[in-house]
Amino acid sequence: QAQLESELWLEKHGADLKSIHFVEVPFPEMAGALERGQVAAALMVEPLITAAGDKVRMLGDAMGAIAPQFVSTGWFASDAWVQANPDVAARFVRAILRTARWANTHHTQSAQILVRSAKLDPVIASKMTRSTYGTKLEPALLQPVVDMFSHFGVLSKPMRADEIIWTASPAVARS
């Protein structure tokens, strides 16, 4: 998805995508590759942006090329599994949303979890830009990503986001 976001940003800013050669560099190695001149630009993510400090310069927000707000992560299951396990699926969704609400309102505590689980420097964790986690999945927030995938041929045909979002029945949602 990172390359598609980059391509979309470049396209919106008038770049000729045929003149650009993309190379895969692991996220933790991007700042070094930039410093050594091995790449001209990189799509970096937090906490690596903050850790790089003034060694890198922001050219633009590739994710912003998709939409001002959109869904950037998701969890997927087959229709057959969801139909066979609707209660488990509903509990999973509730747990994810409950965690998102907690993380959005407990920045200090969630940063401490990042420090422990990702072995992140506490100073970096306190300074980095944090995402706001979605607390409900709305088709309007997923559609820009679906459209990007369609635009670049990842999907064989256009698709409506509301067709791929599972919603628990009211009885299962309350269980």
Annotate the PLM regions.
Residues 1, 12, 55-58, 116, ...:
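A short linear boundary/processing microfeature
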Residues 3-21, 28, 83-87:
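Hinge/capping helix and adjacent helix->loop/strand transition within the periplasmic-binding protein
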Residues 11-26, 36-39, 122-124, 155-163:
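A local structural motif
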Residues 54-56, 72-73, 135-136, 168-172:
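Short secondary-structure transition/capping segments
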Residues 83-156:
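Secondary-structure end/capping motifs
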Residues 150-175:
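Conserved C-terminal helix/tail region of periplasmic/extracytoplasmic solute-binding proteins
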